[in-house]
């Protein structure tokens, strides 16, 4: 068994903790490349109960190859944006999904309104949903659904931020906005599976 940890150090004034988030900011999705590190208990149970899932192919890969893709590293593409005044928040989408992670960086008087219909759901999640007959609410709570990181930025910075990320092959896109609220993430719309 292999176990690893990473520890980072950052100057306090450079921490991107969400405290600069403003009403009207946009929420960007940075795509994931698969399950990353979450949802494996559900997937393992699914493989035990429905072993035929192992015969599935996902975008030319076996099901096992698709679920075992290494977690994408976002550091190289993000480091050039650190220190940018218009970058107000970052949330890594892990267990708890968008709702359970984006809310952690929201100021107390604000909420994020996210249209899940805008999420570019990866095909692997469609296979998991189909075999497990998993409700969308559970899919959104368990998996990243194709969103590895959410980024909160001023709308005026959108062209510069997306152009920067595109240089690294990352096609970031808008999934929501910051509104008045109570530190919650409001999910609207309907997931669209490929």
Positions of predicted regions on the chain:
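Short, compositionally biased
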Residues: 40-51
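Glycine-/charge-enriched secondary-structure boundary and capping motifs
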Residues: 2, 52-68, 72-194
């Amino acid at each position: 068994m292999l176990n690893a940890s990473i520890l980072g150090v950052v100057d306090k004034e450079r921490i991107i903790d969400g405290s600069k988030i403003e009403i009207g900011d946009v929420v960007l999705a940075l795509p994931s490349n698969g399950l990353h590190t979450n949802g494996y208990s559900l997937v393992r149970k699914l493989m035990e109960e429905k072993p035929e899932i192992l015969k599935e192919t996902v975008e030319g890969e076996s099901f096992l190859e698709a679920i075992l893709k290494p977690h994408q590293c976002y550091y190289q593409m993000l480091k050039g944006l650190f220190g940018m005044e218009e970058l107000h928040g970052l949330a890594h989408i892990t267990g708890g999904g968008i709702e359970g992670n984006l809310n952690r960086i929201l100021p107390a008087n604000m909420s994020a309104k996210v249209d899940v219909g805008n999420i570019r759901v990866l095909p692997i999640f469609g296979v998991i949903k189909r075999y497990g007959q998993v409700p969308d609410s559970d899919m959104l709570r368990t998996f990243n659904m194709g969103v590895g990181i959410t980024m909160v930025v001023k709308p005026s910075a959108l062209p510069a931020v997306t152009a920067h990320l595109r240089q690294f092959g990352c096609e970031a896109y808008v999934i929501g906005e910051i509104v008045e609220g109570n530190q919650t993430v409001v999910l609207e719309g309907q997931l669209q599976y490929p």
